[in-house]
Curated annotation (Swiss-Prot):
Region forming the signal peptide: 1-28
Location within or outside the cell: Secreted
Residues of this chain annotated as glycosylated in UniProt: 51
Listed name of the protein: Evasin P1104
Main subcellular localisation: secreted
Origin superkingdom: Eukaryota
GO terms, molecular function: C-X-C chemokine binding
Length: 94
C-alpha cells in the first residue's frame, strides 16, 4: 500500500513538473516579437484596374508600377501594385 501511494505521488509530481515547464515555454514564446510584427517585413498590395495576358512568353497589359501576377499555367493574370519597390527581380510566372 505504501509503495502504491509513493507511485501516485511520483506521478503527480511528474505531471506538475511537465505542466509548469509547458506553461513556462508558452509564456516565453508570447513575449518574443512575431515575424509579422518585425520592422520592414510587411507591405501593402493593391489590385490595378487592368488585367494582363501572356502571348509567346511575353506578359503585357500592366501599366505604371503594376506587375502581372498569374495562377498556375493560366495565360491571363491580374495587375498588382506592390506600393514601394519591394521586388527587385521579375516575379516568376505560373
Amino acid at each position: 500500500m505504501a509503495s502504491n501511494l509513493f507511485t501516485i505521488f511520483q506521478l503527480a509530481g511528474f505531471v506538475a513538473i511537465v505542466f509548469i515547464v509547458n506553461l513556462h515555454s508558452v509564456s516565453a514564446e508570447s513575449k518574443e516579437a512575431s515575424a509579422s510584427q518585425g520592422p520592414g517585413k510587411s507591405f501593402k498590395v493593391e489590385f490595378c484596374e487592368t488585367n494582363c495576358t501572356e502571348n509567346n512568353g511575353v506578359w503585357s497589359g500592366c501599366t505604371g508600377d503594376c506587375i502581372c501576377v498569374s495562377v498556375g499555367d493560366s495565360k491571363e493574370g491580374r495587375c498588382m501594385d506592390l506600393g514601394d519597390k519591394v521586388i527587385d527581380t521579375p516575379v516568376a510566372q505560373g
